[in-house]
C-alpha cells in the first residue's frame, strides 16, 4: 500500500493539516508519546507527523576543546548537542519509524528559510531522502491547505534551503570562533569569563562603541543667543534673534546693546 508521509513544523500544525486533508476524521496515534495522524485523502493513505522546530543543529565533527578557528562542522541531532533538547529524540525516532513504511514524502513546514531547513534536515537525516514534495501555504485554513496540497511542487525550495543553511553555518562560524577568541583573550589577561559574540551582536556592539567614542570625544563649543520677552494685549510672547546662535560673544553683546535701545 502506497503511503505518503507529510511532515509539519510543529504538532499543532500537523493536526490542522490532517483535519484539512482527511476524507473523514483522521485517526490520532502516538509513538513514544509523540502524536501523528493516519488518514485517507481522495482514497490515498497518508500519515501526518511533525518536527518540533529544529530537530538538528550544527556542531563540530570532532570536539577539540576551546580551539579556534573551527570550520569542520556537521548537522547532528539536537539532543546530542544540548541536554535541554532531550525531548527532540522522540520526534526524530517517530519520523524514522514512519518513514520506513512511506514511499512518498511531502514537506509542509512554514514556507520560509527556517521552515525549509527544518524540512530538509527531517528529510535527509530522519527519512534518508534527498528531496521531497513541498506544500506552500501562508495560513492553516482548510481551503489554503487543500490548495497547497493540490498544487504542491515536486521538489523542496532549494533556494530557501541553501540560503537558510548558509545562514546557520555563518552564525556558527562567526559566533563560536569569535566567542572562543574573546574568552581566550580574557583568560590571557589573568582572568576568566565566558564571552559571547554573534553575527548580529558583534556589528551592533561596534556601532554602540563608535557612538560612545563620539560622545566621549565631543567638545562643546559655547554660543550665545538673544531673546526678547514682550508684552501685548493678549499676553506675553517670546521672540529670538533671527541669527539664532552667535559663536562670538563680542558680536552677540554688540547686537544686544543695539537692540536694547530700540
Region spans (language model):
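Intrinsically disordered, low-complexity regulatory segments
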Residues: 1-176, 240-260
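C-terminal or mid-to-C-terminal helical accessory/interaction module adjacent to the motor/catalytic core
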Residues: 87-93, 100-101, 143-230, 234
Amino acid at each position: 500500500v502506497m503511503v505518503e508521509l507529510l511532515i509539519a513544523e510543529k504538532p499543532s500544525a500537523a493536526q490542522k493539516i490532517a483535519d484539512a486533508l482527511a476524507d473523514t476524521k483522521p485517526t490520532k496515534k502516538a509513538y513514544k508519546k509523540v502524536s501523528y495522524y493516519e488518514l485517507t485523502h481522495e482514497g490515498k493513505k497518508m500519515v501526518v507527523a511533525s518536527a518540533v522546530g529544529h530537530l538538528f543543529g550544527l556542531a563540530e565533527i570532532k570536539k577539540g576543546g576551546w580551539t579556534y578557528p573551527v570550520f569542520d562542522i556537521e548537522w547532528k541531532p539536537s539532543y546530542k548537542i544540548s541536554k535541554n533538547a532531550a525531548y527532540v529524540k522522540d520526534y526524530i525516532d517517530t519520523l524514522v519509524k514512519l518513514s520506513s513504511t512511506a514511499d512518498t514524502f511531502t514537506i509542509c513546514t512554514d514556507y520560509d528559510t527556517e521552515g525549509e531547513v527544518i524540512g530538509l534536515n527531517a528529510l535527509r537525516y530522519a527519512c534518508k531522502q534527498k528531496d521531497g514534495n513541498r506544500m506552500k501555504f501562508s495560513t492553516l485554513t482548510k481551503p489554503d491547505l487543500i490548495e497547497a496540497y493540490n498544487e504542491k511542487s515536486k521538489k523542496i525550495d532549494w533556494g530557501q534551503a541553501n540560503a537558510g543553511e548558509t545562514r546557520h553555518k555563518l552564525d556558527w562560524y562567526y559566533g563560536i570562533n569569535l566567542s572562543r577568541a574573546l574568552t581566550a583573550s580574557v583568560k590571557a589577561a589573568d582572568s576568566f569569563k565566558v564571552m559571547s559574540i554573534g553575527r548580529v551582536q558583534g556589528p551592533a556592539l561596534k556601532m554602540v562603541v563608535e557612538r560612545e567614542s563620539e560622545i566621549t570625544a565631543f567638545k562643546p563649543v559655547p554660543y550665545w543667543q538673544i531673546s526678547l520677552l514682550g508684552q501685548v494685549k493678549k499676553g506675553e510672547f517670546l521672540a529670538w534673534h533671527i541669527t539664532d546662535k552667535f559663536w562670538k560673544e563680542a558680536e552677540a553683546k554688540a547686537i544686544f546693546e543695539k537692540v536694547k535701545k530700540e
